[in-house]
Amino acid sequence: MDTLSYKTISANKETAHKEWVVVDATDQVVGRLGSKVAKLLRGKYKPDFTPHADCGDNVIIINADKVKFTGNKWNDKVYLRYTGYPGGQREMTPAQLMKKPNGEEKLLKRVVKGMLPKNRLGAQLLGNLYVYAGSEHKHEAQTPKSIDINSVSYTHLTLPT
């Protein structure tokens, strides 16, 4: 038995098969949508997943203004940020955040960012996420595939062919 023939394949920037996918966020719960999008960005459904490399897909989220929260989280959930100055802790609810310019994009990017690694790779992966409030996006040249995020399961993530 030749054990030298068993090589572990690690994906890198050149060998990663990155695709463009479109996810419709209409009537999706924010946390569940963010979790599945983070897995798509990370590439965890791919057989050549490598933890230290960007081998995930580029994800376009459309209809970000139609997401929903369960319960009364629109008004009860609080997002905190700190300005860096004494007494500079600011809080904002999702309802207040959605009223701001590009609030839909900021909300979903913040949710997905919390589910990615807290290092340089996580920042790079977040750059592969594009969020749009309406149904139009500017990435038609990349010919993205439209996927149903509900059909993407936790145990076996698959993309339609």
State what each model feature region is.
Residues 18, 44, 81, 110-113, ...:
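Basic side chains
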Residues 155-161:
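Conserved small/polar residues in nucleotide/adenosyl-binding loops
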Residues 107-151:
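Positively charged, low-complexity, intrinsically disordered RNA-binding extensions
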Residues 2-84, 89-106, 144-151:
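Ribosome large-subunit tunnel/peptidyl-transferase-proximal elements
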Residues 17, 52, 137-139, 156:
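Histidine (H) residue identity feature
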